[in-house]
């Protein structure tokens, strides 16, 4: 009886820990997920880019370099968390007409994060990214303008995600 219970528990643990995307179909669905992100962003892009009065880029080349380097995993994870926890909640409150679209964009980003975690080769990380820390500091210094800046550059973020996933897929 005890042995069966142990074997059953081991099987359950393996099923729980095994990535959902063990087959290639689900791990290869990232291009469609990026298209969905771009499509969702296109619904609010004009609103946020017209309100963005800051000339300097928030998402600098150093972030892309982190994405391409050994910190890629952590940089991507931190940036997704940054957008989901700091940028999007504030962006939803900028315009009632944009709220649902920003919410939809956030849901697409959450889905992507979940899929990346389940396809472990894309997010096996634990280090900190200096570029992300700099972005967060610049964002906070911009105060209310930071929302428009971060949201107006979301397409750059999607491009960086795509670059990261292209490298990891090799």
Swiss-Prot record:
- Please give the organism: Epstein-Barr virus (strain B95-8)
What are the recorded GO MF terms, alphabetically?
A: cytokine activity
Question: Which superkingdom does the taxonomy of this entry point to?
Answer: Viruses
Family the UniProt entry places it in: Belongs to the IL-10 family.
Q: How does it assemble?
A: Homodimer.
Family annotation (SMART domains): IL10
Q: Which PANTHER family match?
A: INTERLEUKIN-10, INTERLEUKIN-19-RELATED
Instruction: Report the leader peptide range.
Output: 1-23
* Cystine residue pairs: 27-119, 73-125
Where is this protein localized, as stated in its record?
Secreted
Q: Which residues form a coiled coil?
A: 97-145
Q: What are the BP-aspect GO terms?
A: immune response; regulation of cytokine production; symbiont-mediated activation of host anti-inflammatory cytokine signaling; symbiont-mediated suppression of host interferon-mediated signaling pathway; symbiont-mediated suppression of host pro-inflammatory cytokine signaling
**Keywords (A to Z) from UniProt:** Coiled coil, Cytokine, Disulfide bond, Evasion of host immunity by viral interleukin-like protein, Glycoprotein, Host-virus interaction, Secreted, Signal, Viral immunoevasion
State a single Pfam family of this protein: IL10
| Cellular component GO terms, alphabetical | extracellular space
Name this polypeptide is given: Viral interleukin-10 homolog
Report the function annotation for this chain. Answer: Plays a role in masking infected cells for immune recognition by cytotoxic T-lymphocytes. Down-regulates the expression of the host TAP1 gene (transporter associated with antigen processing), thereby affecting the transport of peptides into the endoplasmic reticulum and subsequent peptide loading by MHC class I molecules. Inhibits IFN-gamma synthesis.
Name the glycosylated positions: 127
């Amino acid at each position: 009886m005890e042995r069966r219970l142990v074997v059953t528990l081991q099987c359950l643990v393996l099923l729980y820990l095994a990535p959902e995307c063990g087959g290639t179909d689900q791990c290869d669905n990232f291009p469609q997920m990026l298209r969905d992100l771009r499509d969702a962003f296109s619904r609010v892009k004009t609103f946020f880019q017209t309100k963005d009065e800051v000339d300097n880029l928030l998402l600098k080349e150093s972030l892309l370099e982190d994405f391409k380097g050994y910190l890629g995993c952590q940089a991507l994870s931190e940036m997704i968390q940054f957008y989901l926890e700091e940028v999007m909640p504030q962006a939803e409150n900028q315009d009632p007409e944009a709220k649902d679209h920003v919410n939809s964009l956030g849901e697409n980003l959450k889905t992507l994060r979940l899929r990346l975690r389940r396809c472990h080769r894309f997010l096996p990380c634990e280090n900190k990214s200096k570029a992300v820390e700099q972005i967060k500091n610049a964002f906070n210094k911009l105060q209310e303008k930071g929302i428009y800046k971060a949201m107006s550059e979301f397409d750059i973020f999607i491009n960086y995600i795509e670059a990261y996933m292209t490298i990891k897929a090799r």
